[in-house]
From Swiss-Prot:
Its EC number is 2.3.2.27. Residues 51-64 have a biased composition (Polar residues). GO terms for biological process: ERAD pathway; granzyme-mediated apoptotic signaling pathway; neuron projection development; proteasome-mediated ubiquitin-dependent protein catabolic process; protein autoubiquitination; protein catabolic process; protein folding; protein monoubiquitination. Residues 16-33, 76-99, 937-948 have a biased composition (Low complexity). Changing residue 1140 to A: Loss of E3 ubiquitin protein ligase activity. It comes from Mus musculus. This is Ubiquitin conjugation factor E4 B.
Amino acid sequence: MEELSADEIRRRRLARLAGGQTSQPTTPLTSPQRENPPGPPIAASAPGPSQSLGLNVHNMTPATSPIGAAGVAHRSQSSEGVSSLSSSPSNSLETQSQSLSRSQSMDIDGVSCEKSMSQVDVDSGIENMEVDENDRREKRSLSDKEPSSGPEVSEEQALQLVCKIFRVSWKDRDRDVIFLSSLSAQFKQNPKEVFSDFKDLIGQILMEVLMMSTQTRDENPFASLTATSQPIATAARSPDRNLMLNTGSSSGTSPMFCNMGSFSTSSLSSLGASGGASNWDSYSDHFTIETCKETDMLNYLIECFDRVGIEEKKAPKMCSQPAVSQLLSNIRSQCISHTALVLQGSLTQPRSLQQPSFLVPYMLCRNLPYGFIQELVRTTHQDEEVFKQIFIPILQGLALAAKECSLESDYFKYPLMALGELCETKFGKTHPMCNLVASLPLWLPKSLSPGSGRELQRLSYLGAFFSFSVFAEDDAKVVEKYFSGPAITLENTRVVSQSLQHYLELGRQELFKILHSILLNGETREAALSYMAALVNANMKKAQMQADDRLVSTDGFMLNLLWVLQQLSTKIKLETVDPTYIFHPRCRITLPNDETRINATMEDVNERLTELYGDQPPFSEPKFPTECFFLTLHAHHLSILPSCRRYIRRLRAIRELNRTVEDLKNNESQWKDSPLATRHREMLKRCKTQLKKLVRCKACADAGLLDESFLRRCLNFYGLLIQLMLRILDPAYPDVTLPLNSEVPKVFAALPEFYVEDVAEFLFFIVQYSPQVLYEPCTQDIVMFLVVMLCNQNYIRNPYLVAKLVEVMFMTNPSVQPRTQKFFEMIENHPLSTKLLVPSLMKFYTDVEHTGATSEFYDKFTIRYHISTIFKSLWQNIAHHGTFMEEFNSGKQFVRYINMLINDTTFLLDESLESLKRIHEVQEEMKNKEQWDQLPRDQQQARQSQLAQDERVSRSYLALATETVDMFHLLTKQVQKPFLRPELGPRLAAMLNFNLQQLCGPKCRDLKVENPEKYGFEPKKLLDQLTDIYLQLDCARFAKAIADDQRSYSKELFEEVISKMRKAGIKSTIAIEKFKLLAEKVEEIVAKNARAEIDYSDAPDEFRDPLMDTLMTDPVRLPSGTVMDRSIILRHLLNSPTDPFNRQMLTESMLEPVPELKEQIQAWMREKQSSDH
């Protein structure tokens, strides 16, 4: 084969360029790294047809080349863009631009930026990537949009365009261009041999410029360039780029790069109470561009890349021509390729993965040209080593920046946005950055200590990004910045809270982008799920009531995770969720072995596992919707609920501190002259300081927790959970029928108890603190769930869980929370509630007598108070009124309920009135100042402490007692018969008599206290209600029960009651007369009993009740063989359904009458009566 001459080689190379190549070699080549510019090319090109585009270098001479100073001069005002070029080499670029513009449409084509995603130049030293066919089609279609209407671009114009973009010249020196001396010498020597094609020329230009920059500072090639259109200089002026860069100041710094600046003041900063300046020092290391040779090179390459886009916008039709488009694409590729070389240290000194990347400040300051970072990813991701060497330092730099940023300013979002953009970069179906992030050693580090939750937050790669928080305990800077002013007004706090919630939303949206991209990427989906599951499992202790905060992730971190999971779960359809996932052998969530189940023991759970999976290997893999749903469910358990509990604890602490401060202030006159005055003043000062701190922390928590949109997302997710559980309870959902099947579904019984408890706790929280959130589409399902659970209490083993559901209903009662009246009406008017809700609540009222807890005796009063309040509201509803009446007349259940009412009223009134007596006693002592001052100091303090304790007890018990008496008053007005049963009537009469004696007896003055309304004590109202109950039950049987009470009843007591009612005007004259008639009737029975009194104390032992040691009148035999009096054992069974001697289960139906013994007793009594007379 005949050897080609140098001229023939040149012609064929130019012809190939003119043909508009669409593909590039895939063999990686390395840019020559040398001080001198590249010489003439050596390798020959394959022969190809010569096409005329006017790009023939044979016609080029130094005299006609467009490389003079004027040829690349920019106007100083040209920062908005660079004009197109004309074909005249003799005029300045300004004149040429005007000439060419007349023949080109100057419409801005927004899609021209898409051409920026080009292939990598062969001189970069980085392996080229095949362009996706879709990309090719897209580029062709974009080119077809605006067919060229002007003349084809000549080679001279193309050279002018290259020089303008790179701001270089190889003819004349000027302050606005970089003079390329080596290239100039080659053009003078032999212009035909300088470059083989434009890619070669671009490579030589860039290499010479960059190698020049590696020289000493005195020879900085960028020093003569003035700032024009580069993004770095304009970033600070852009409305959405409010960060200026700090490049330092030195004589060698090019004026084209921005000098020391400061962040603009955030709009949020002006709202802070302190009004302090931004903490620039905290972020300057990460947001400042270091002044060095590498950043000089990067600035130059970034600006060149940006000028390509400017040219495309200024002259879209010209740039759409294949040759120009390919040229601009090559320029972009070469800029990116040389950027990669700079970042690797190939042009200066090699860099390790531990060194921070020079590119991080540019990314944080949001001033890289559109498509720059994506093109860098595209160019490098096929070479794994190069890709890691460039992007691992970038990822580390972003994580460090995220770790040091805070919500005290809006800087926190920039690391998130930068990582989000990286992760969203996609080529085909692959997200290269997601692959790299998930392959990092710290993606999911192994736990090294018991505090695995806090470890994951601190050590895992994404931990730093998820850690931003508004809570004071997570980030003290937030409270200091926004809530530490001398006077924090309510309006100011509201505005700041809204702004903080907005910033939280922005940050969480970026977190969602990051995690969503990693999940979308098939290669990293498993890693993402494993990471989320690890966070959930590592923070299981966060659900504990007294969790050690040092061992678990912060509240802010967990709420951020929850927000992201909520977004991932938004479109999940329940039909795709497997309700048995929590039992699946491949379930990612690890529940503690002692996790309480709704209605099952661990043995039951293990049986269920065997039934589900014991004989069916291999198991079907859980689907993503199922895994995502349950991860979100458990994230709620570990984030929003612990945060709510902390919020409530803080409010309680604020109330207690307020009370302490008020007490100290109110009693200052007593201690200001005492030896303890200094101590009290110090305590007052400490309490005020602590109170101020807690109020500020609450303001932060308000912003983080009382976010309506976030709470609505939580409520809607719990609505999904409720739907899932209702489907398990009744597959016919939404057409649920009550009562449910007596056998509890095994899947439901084995579910963790907190699935139900969390719903109750969350509802309780929003009803109290954000009731407007309650009305969502899911509300109907929530109402149905409450009704179903309250009417089927046997489905829940833990009575305290049922009590929480009752408390939710109580809290929505209009008398408690007026803003939830609509919700309460939805419950009471629900079709499933009208027949079963009242009897179910009445049954629970009695069942709660025994809960199994050590505090059951005191707990029952609060629970019954809630039920009584609910009953009073339901009584007003016509639909429930009939159910009440049916229950009143049905017998056994209502009788037990009345028995508990009697028990509670007896205890609560007794305790309340006794505490009032003690309060009266101490108050009387303190009134006698002389006597009080004589008491020793420690005795005074003990008495004051007892007074405070009695005041708390009195307030609490009187509130409960008042509600119980109200219920008694209501019931006795409607129905009387059950109250007169033998096992109830005497006890009720004795209770009423005793309390009348307390209110009107000889010692009633002991109940007189200062400010009785402070304790909720209304003696007139109480007396009125008690005497009303007497009148409502007025009959011969009740009068006999009153007369039989020998402990409290007396004629004088009733006379005193009548006198007080008349004197205080408590009742009408008619009512008083009725009460007087009842008193006379009772007195007649007392006199009759006295005349017929017979002493039965010598009755034989077999006639005596073994429990009460009284004469039996209706003996019955228990299953154990013991014989008791029927009235006594029935009274016992009302309190406890057990045999009093062996604690075995016992019901009334198990009692066996003993007629023979009864006859013997009656015969003995007749004999006794006849002998006495």
